[in-house]
UniProtKB/Swiss-Prot annotation:
UniProt binding sites for Mg(2+) 2: 405
Source organism phylogeny: Bacteria, Bacillati, Mycoplasmatota, Mycoplasmoidales, Metamycoplasmataceae
Entry's Gene Ontology cellular component terms: cytosol
A Pfam family it matches: tRNA_anti-codon
Transmembrane segments: none
GO molecular function term, any single one: magnesium ion binding
Protein name: Lysine--tRNA ligase
Disulfide bonds listed in the record: none
Known cofactor(s): Mg(2+)
Enzyme Commission number(s) of this protein: 6.1.1.6
Amino acid sequence: MERKFSEQEQVRRDKVTALEKQNIRAFSQTIKPTHTSEEIHANFANKEREDIEKTNTIAVLNGRVIAQRGPFLVLQGRSSTLQIYVDKKALNEETLIILKQLDLGDIISATGLVSKTHTGELMIKASDIKLLTKSLIPLPDKFHGLVDREDRYRHRYVDTIVNEDVKKTFILRSKIIKLIREYFDNLNFLEVDTPVLQPILGGAAAKPFITYYNALNCNFYLRIATELPLKKLIVGGFERVYEIGRIFRNEGIDTTHNPEFTSIEFYEAYSDMWGMMERTEGVFRYIAEKLNVQKLNFAGKEIDITKPFAKINMVDAVSEKIGVNVRELDDKKALELAKQHDIKVEKYFKLGHVIEALFEKYIEETLIQPTFVYGHPLDISPLAFKDESDPRFTQRAELFICTKEFANMYTELNDPFDQLQRFEAQLDEKNAGNEEANEIDWDFVKALEYGMPPTGGCGIGIERLIMFFTENDSIREVLLFPQLKAVSQK
């Protein structure tokens, strides 16, 4: 099918032809810049015009033309803009031809003297302009812009050109990830990489993406967590490890979920759930300190990051809310209780699943300020250490902010006999219809048989953390290329 162009798109293509007839390339090799707009601002912003011109600084500046104001072109750099003053009387014939065919969105290289306008704005007095790249599609106009969310996500490369705040969000995302690494590196954690393709499903309760490994003639999973290989490294004597990487879960898409996302998981020998709470609160505080923030507006609420994070027991919170001590229930009575509270019961449900459902229904919505919820049921925590005072529950905790889960942490199970029993229970759940249940990872059981020291482990969703610190309400706002339904590319 032949592609149809708008009138403006056709005009730009005609300009390419006109330039080529003048032996001027519309798509050129680079010209090495001597400065960036950021460097020019840093070096000359606080100087007077006369003092700047005395330095006789000739700059070669590359950038995208995003505006034209009389004799001035505005070039967009990495994080700032700079004006180019165009005096046609001072320019050669080739430059004049380029200017005649120039459009907003074109990428140029401007050479000239660094100076300031009479109103004190930095500029370059152009002595030469070269065309580096002709833009064939007009940018959205500055009045209407690119405002439709799906259009913005689908054409992120345009979004970051015309919406400066969006670009700043992703620059901040990169900075936050660097700060996370800095925090754990300072604590002598070792960053590692583990396989994305896994032969066994495990490490989290999630539905996987499945692929076929031709060379091995079998199905593999895109990892749903990095937990099991990282704990194998703890067995191997590394003691403190972390991994920042992509995770894949074949599940729904909403404001806080994307099938492909980034997580950090970290594991520390001779620690536990309480130590992981300390590390998790520590990384949040470290980021806040480095970004110089104390309070954030997130999901319509003001969150004070300087106060100690609260801690509540999941089972106690549910019992208090519904007026029933759920610790005293068996599976049968728990299922009866679920029906009383209009909770949909699955075939594999036990006491722990009911407690989790009651928590999600009644307690989650009350968790606004940063709160650790601990003491999860064993039924929903197959990799966590049992609570010694009541083995139906575990040393597991989650961090909630504004009703959303941000982190999941355990005192890790290091008993190979117990771990195998839990894997077998998970297999029973899988056979009963729970698609998120784990399989038996025999190699992990074998690793535990060699001996894993008492260990604390935690996973944090990077996107949710970045949503929090950038005060965004949707995960798509912090993913450069979020998943969207396919549309025609014509």
